[in-house]
Amino acid sequence: MKIKNKSMVYWSCRRGMLELDIIINNFFKKEFDFLSNKEKIFFVNMLSYDDIYLYKCLIFNYEPKNKKIKKIIKLIKRSSFSFS
């Protein structure tokens, strides 16, 4: 899968939970352009997961079984929850 339309990816970042909207949109705005092509694909795939699952992963430290999604979750958490 190739990332052809960045604005469509951005639109897909919109979630039904405010907390996820803030975390995922901020990550997209700050970090998406710096991801490798593989990481971009992992990120887009992660967006297909439902909100409750992503919320558990990002807020309650649930570990995804999928290693690719786990990597993106780790990047999002590092970006979102760093206080530097």
Curated annotation (Swiss-Prot):
SUPFAM superfamilies: YgfY-like
The organism's place on the tree of life at top rank: Bacteria
An individual GO BP term: succinate metabolic process
UniProt xrefs under InterPro entries: SDH, SDH_sf, SdhE_FAD_assembly_factor
CC per GO annotation: cytoplasm
Cytoplasm in keyword set: yes
Location(s) in or outside the cell: Cytoplasm
Keywords: Chaperone, Cytoplasm
Function: An FAD assembly protein, which accelerates covalent attachment of the cofactor into other proteins. Plays an essential role in the assembly of succinate dehydrogenase (SDH, respiratory complex II), an enzyme complex that is a component of both the tricarboxylic acid cycle and the electron transport chain, and which couples the oxidation of succinate to fumarate with the reduction of ubiquinone (coenzyme Q) to ubiquinol. Required for flavinylation (covalent attachment of FAD) of the flavoprotein subunit SdhA of SDH and other flavinylated proteins as well.
Family, as annotated: Belongs to the SdhE FAD assembly factor family.
Designated name of the protein: FAD assembly factor SdhE
Species: Wigglesworthia glossinidia brevipalpis
